[in-house]
Amino acid sequence: MSSTKAEKSDDGKVSGRFMLKLSGEAFSGGGGLGVDPDVVHAIAREIAAVVRDGAQIAIVIGGGNFFRGAELQVRGMDRARSDYMGMLGTVMNCLALQDFLEKEGVDCRVQTAITMGQVAEPYIPLRAVRHLEKGRVVIFGAGMGMPYFSTDTTAAQRALEIDAEALLMGKNGVDGVYDSDPKTNPDAVKFDALGYGEVITRDLKVADATAVTLCRDNSLPIVVFELLKEGNIARAVKGEKIGTLVGDQGSRD
């Protein structure tokens, strides 16, 4: 799993299987609470376009537009219970994206780590792979189904289990990995590429250390890019040089 580039056939179609990790905060549009249908529809259109081009797309969505377990813990809530609230929030995002993907004519299945049979399938890895092989999008909801695990870690684990080529992390309002927060430091420097070890030792805010370590131990490349810039999902899938690549070598060569 060393390349992030989808293969392209003579007819211009792309192939390859990718895990797309979407920021839950982006679903609210302006960083507030809830779901902005216009934003979700725009994301769905971009995903539908790459699926029609032949890519196999699995998705994990955060729940930051509803709840963040770690933040609720700081405010006095039990961490495990607040994490479960966050997991349920991700399912609402999954259903919203599923609806708009199907409006775009793309078959879509939601699989959840917490069983909720009336709205989604249970998480069954082999079934997820069969869906992908049939051209369906699979959205994984409810995180890992256990507290203390982030949706970034979920995305890394699911990507490995379905044998994805790369983990594509669509961020809200930031176009890659920087040496400091570009929202507060105008002199922040963006990285073109990084090694896994450097991300961990410098505590760069790509994903939590568990997720990055999983990717490092299994040589799963990560591409961090701005989610809401038009065309970026397709660029990431096609292997164009956008955002920041995190991999074994720390370069794009």
Swiss-Prot record:
Catalytic activity, reaction form: UMP + ATP = UDP + ADP
Ligand binding (UMP): G63, D83, M144, G145, M146, P147, Y148, F149, S150, T151
Keyword terms: Allosteric enzyme, ATP-binding, Cytoplasm, Kinase, Nucleotide-binding, Pyrimidine biosynthesis, Transferase
EC number annotated for this UniProt entry: 2.7.4.22
One Pfam short name: AA_kinase
Keyword Methyltransferase: no
GO CC terms of this entry: cytoplasm
Chloroplast listed as a keyword: no
Gene3D superfamilies linked to this entry: Acetylglutamate kinase-like (3.40.1160.10)
Gene Ontology molecular function terms on file: ATP binding; UMP kinase activity
Subcellular location: Cytoplasm
GO BP field: 'de novo' CTP biosynthetic process; UDP biosynthetic process
Region (Involved in allosteric activation by GTP): 29-34
Alphabetical list of CDD domains matching this protein: AAK_UMPK-PyrH-Ec
Top EC class of this enzyme: transferase
Function of the molecule: Catalyzes the reversible phosphorylation of UMP to UDP.
Subunit field text: Homohexamer.
Cross-referenced PANTHER family: URIDYLATE KINASE, URIDYLATE KINASE PUMPKIN, CHLOROPLASTIC
Name the UniProt record assigns to this protein: Uridylate kinase
Organism: Streptomyces coelicolor (strain ATCC BAA-471 / A3(2) / M145)
